[in-house]
Amino acid sequence: MDNITNNTETFDCDVLVIGGGTAGPMAALKAKMKNPDATVVVLEKANVKRSGAISMGMDGLNNTVIPGHATAEQYTKEITIANDGICDQKPVYKYAENCFDIIQELDSYGIRFLKDENGDYDVKKVHHIGTYVLPMPNGDTVKKALYRQLRRRRLLITNRYMATRLLTGPDGRIAGAIAVNTRDATFLTIRAKAVILCMGAAGRLGLPASGYLYGTYENAANSGDGYAMAYHAGAQLANLECYQINPLIKDYNGPACAYVAGPFGGY
């Protein structure tokens, strides 16, 4: 069902996933695969069918670690260099280790990645160390494919509800969340045994100097609300001083990151 909140003020579930962009559906699917009998809810402030930073599609993945093209060690080194050494290498390495399995899983969902005449992933060279860029000919179907998987596994979806605070139990453990409807301002309390935050980054925390809302490369929903919720619930936040925002070039549509020029002699 697409909406569990008709005339409902409270709801109980096993796992609450806040955020229905890309990470949220993946987390919800993993939870359901782990325990098919679990009640898993995806809470989204827009609509899961077309929400998140990848809502309108993606022309490629810039950070794929595929055997034969790159190693986890190479990727970790590349990311460390790109960030001037300010990098927590453990999660970066873990991401690199799991990357290929996730790509194959997405491939099985019908998300098509560019392949060569031998049927291998056609990864492109952009970074200094290793080869990581994997084009996606039908990247506009990512959300459709993920939504099909959610429906197939009968996960519960609550659209148009924005989480505002995490709930904690007497022992300090997270016990659910409070959300407000973005259309009629009604409140919903969801009690959960486990809560997973998949709420995107904070690249739209402020406006560009021009004041133009879409003058950056960041999705408008990436407002940092997940960080705020975690902080208010007692979580320790790290690396917020490493703020990244990608300005756009006027009247230009396409990749415009400076590091693209590096392997070709630019600086």
Q: Which stretches of residues belong to each language-model region?
A:
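Residues forming the flavin
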Residues: 1-77, 115, 135-267
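Short secondary-structure transition/capping motifs
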Residues: 50, 84, 88-95, 131, ...
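Rossmann-like flavin
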Residues: 82-122
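Gly-rich Lys/Arg/Thr-decorated short loops/hinges at beta-loop-alpha junctions or inter-strand turns
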Residues: 57-59, 83-87, 121-130, 204-210
